[in-house]
Amino acid sequence: GFKNVQLSTARGF
């Protein structure tokens, strides 16, 4: 989740 950092915060990737 480089673009969607906030959305990918759970995964981190």
UniProtKB/Swiss-Prot annotation:
It comes from the Eukaryota. Keywords: Amidation, Neuropeptide. The lineage of its organism: Eukaryota, Metazoa, Ecdysozoa, Arthropoda, Hexapoda. The modification Phenylalanine amide is found at F13. GO terms for biological process: neuropeptide signaling pathway. This is Allatotropin. It comes from Rhodnius prolixus.
